[in-house]
Curated annotation (Swiss-Prot):
Region called Disordered, residue ranges: 39-132, 305-462
Protein's UniProt name: Integrator complex subunit 12
First and last residues of each zinc finger (PHD-type): 159-215
Cleaved signal peptide residues: none
Stretches with biased composition (Basic residues): 449-462
Gene behind the chain: INTS12
Compositional bias per record (Basic and acidic residues), positions renumbered to this chain: 88-125
Pfam families, sorted: PHD
Keyword Heme carried by entry: no
Organism: Bos taurus
């Protein structure tokens, strides 16, 4: 109620200041009477007896007018006027009170005073009910509403209340849980799905709300997708770097030959199981001079054993050169699907080169000392002639097979068929690839890995 008392006392102090600053001689007496009567009766009655002392008959007439006008003015005025309006009305009253005091001393006629006194009391009647309403009704209502709203707003601003229900109540099975990502508080029952007691009590557990968990899953999926895309590009870059160096006519089969180079490890195991492990090991050690050429042949022609079979069959069938050369090209395409049969085809082709009755004789003759010499000669021919003329490779290798495998009978037939077999581009690489299978595969694998590493480093630099 201290605030209410201050609001009621403000107009009285303003009146007192008006009397102090006035130049009239009776201002001191009026000030005393104003204070005494205002303390005894209140604001409305304090002003009227001071006027009665001066002129009792005239104020009686004005009193009735002011009483009639009080309910009208109080009802017409709004209840929510500010203190600024009250101050302005009180200033008007001060000026009005100065004038009648001076006029009463100078003995001005009654006709001039009567119309002015009701005007003086009208602003007083307006100001008095306003101060009462603002002090009692409005002040208490504003304070109570402010306290209620400010407590809720303060709790929400500080993050002490649940985001869903906006309350701070905590029960045994319904505690407030804080999300470690967004730092919002949720009741166990308000959050969907409901939070278990184990998740609340366990200090090791980091709890996230449902919205944050969804966002974290999306971010994890986005980060996993980009590294998956460059993986196939690395595989496609590796053959593109190597294959143009090896052979230009077979550029269409670049991506497929790289995958078959990995699968040839199974073919290698099948040849060892067939009973020729000793012969293949010796032949691989004896043919170390052709490791580089065999590695190139392993990448470019994946169906090498099948083409070797056709070239050796062409050596026996000397009367059909055109058909053998024509058959080698489509088999080079279809041999991509028959990788598992490559080892068996190479064995059958090598047996056909010597004689159809003796099955597995050609691999042991390849390990003789003469074969190494013939291979070195064939390598010299390659170095002199170069890659574009592969016919120089065929006579040395095919004569080696025919001369060592079948002493004198198949020699001329081999020389005649070499002229016909020199036409296709796949025959020289296939005839060279037959003897060296293990080391060529290892070298091919190593070179593929090196190219992949280089491609990966280039991408990281970019």
């Amino acid at each position: 109620m201290a605030a209410a008392v201050n609001l009621e006392l403000d107009p009285i102090f303003l009146k007192a200041l008006g009397f102090l600053h006035s130049k009239s001689k009776d201002s001191a007496e009026k000030l005393k009477t104003l204070l005494d009567e205002s303390l005894a009766r209140g604001i409305d009655s304090s002003y009227r007896p001071s006027q009665k002392d001066v002129e009792p008959p005239k104020i009686s007439s004005t009193k009735t007018v002011s009483v009639k006008q009080e309910p009208k003015t109080s009802s017409s005025l709004p209840s929510g006027n500010n203190n600024g309006k009250v101050l302005t009305t009180e200033k008007v009253k001060k000026e009005g009170e100065k004038r009648p005091a001076d006029k009463m001393k100078s003995d001005i006629t009654e006709g001039a005073d009567v119309p002015k006194k009701p005007r003086l009391e009208k602003p007083e009647t307006r100001s008095s009910p306003i101060t009462v309403q603002t002090s009692k009704d409005l002040a208490m209502a504003d304070l109570s509403s402010f306290e209620e709203t400010s407590a809720d707003d303060f709790a929400m601003e500080m993050g002490l209340a649940c985001v869903v229900c906006r309350q701070m109540t905590v029960a045994s099975g319904n505690q407030l849980v804080e999300c470690q990502e967004c730092h919002n508080l949720y009741h166990q029952d308000c959050h969907k799905p409901q939070v278990t007691d184990k998740e609340v009590t366990d200090p090791r557990l980091v709890w996230y709300c449902a919205r944050c968990t969804r966002q974290m899953k999306r971010m994890a999926q986005k980060t996993q997708k980009p590294p998956q895309k460059p993986a196939p590009t690395v595989v496609s870059v590796a053959p593109a770097v190597k294959d143009p160096l090896v052979k230009k006519p077979e550029t269409k089969l670049k991506p497929e030959t790289t995958f078959l180079a990995f699968k040839r490890s199974e073919v290698k195991a099948s040849t060892v199981v067939s009973g020729n492990s000793s012969s293949t090991n010796v032949s691989s050690s004896a043919t170390s001079g052709l490791i580089g050429w065999a590695a190139f042949a392993a990448k470019t022609t994946s169906a090498g054993p099948s083409t070797a079979k056709l070239s050796s069959a062409a050596q026996n069938n000397s009367g059909k050169p055109a058909t053998s050369s024509a058959n080698q090209k489509p088999v080079g395409l279809t041999g991509l699907a028959t990788t598992s049969k490559g080892g068996i085809g190479s064995k059958i082709g090598s047996s056909n080169s010597t004689s159809p009755t003796v099955p597995l004789k050609p691999p042991p003759p390849l390990t003789l000392g003469k074969t190494g010499l013939s291979r070195s000669v064939s390598c010299d021919n390659v170095s002199k002639v170069g890659l574009p003329s592969p016919s120089s490779l065929v006579p040395g290798s095919s004569s080696q097979l025919s001369g060592n495998g079948n002493s004198g009978t198949s020699g001329p037939s081999g020389s005649t068929t070499n002229k016909t077999a020199s036409e296709p581009s796949t025959s020289p690489s296939a005839s060279l690839k037959g003897p060296t299978s293990q080391e060529s595969q290892l070298n091919a694998m190593k070179r593929l890995q090196m190219v992949k590493k280089k491609a990966a480093q280039k991408k990281l630099k970019k």
